Amino acid sequence: MVASTHELFNIHPGWLKLFPDEFAAAFAIVESLQSYHPNKDYVFKVFESDPESVNVVVVGQDPYPTAGDAMGLAFSVSRSEKLPKSLQNLFKELQSDLGITRTDGDLSDWQAQGVFLINRVLTVPFSHANGHKNIGWEDFTEKIIRYLGERGAVGLLMGKSAEEMAKYFSKKVITAHPSPLSAYRGFFGSKPFSAVNALLAIPVKW
């Protein structure tokens, strides 16, 4: 069952070798749900990457609850118009930090460079932020994050939920979350992108 399901979700086989039981449990969570974001095909999109290619781990909370926003990568959307506020703020800080102006909300190019954009919770009910908290996702994603951190990846941890994972990273950048509620409480001016690049042998082209 695991093999056929992983093919359906386009998960890199390296993850299945590392965490066969954990993925079986994660697939069961998805099958138990009715209506949720992102689309089922995108729930495990972050795992399309080879685990050996991951150099940076960006930890989010859960997918965007608005229809059409979530696409399986933390903070990312599949379009360039009407970006969510958190992503707008992320891009404002990117401009301030590195002088990079970005309007494309699809962060797949970051993923292609070894940036692992994972939410602690991989699904969300329609229009109900954090509505799938404590249904099993946190245990699954914590094991993944721990593996990557202990393997030497740099952690970019924005917000309290992400900061809970700090213990697994020897190299990390911790800042406030870019949401409108907290962006002015430590995120703006934190220069997280240059800070992450300073910890890498090959910097990310944000």
State what each model feature region is.
Residues 198-206:
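Charged phosphate-binding loop/patch that engages nucleotide di/tri-phosphates or the phosphate backbone
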Residues 10-156, 161-165, 171-174, 180-183, ...:
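A polyanion-binding, active-site-adjacent surface
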Residues 1-7:
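Short, Lys/Arg-enriched, disordered terminal segments
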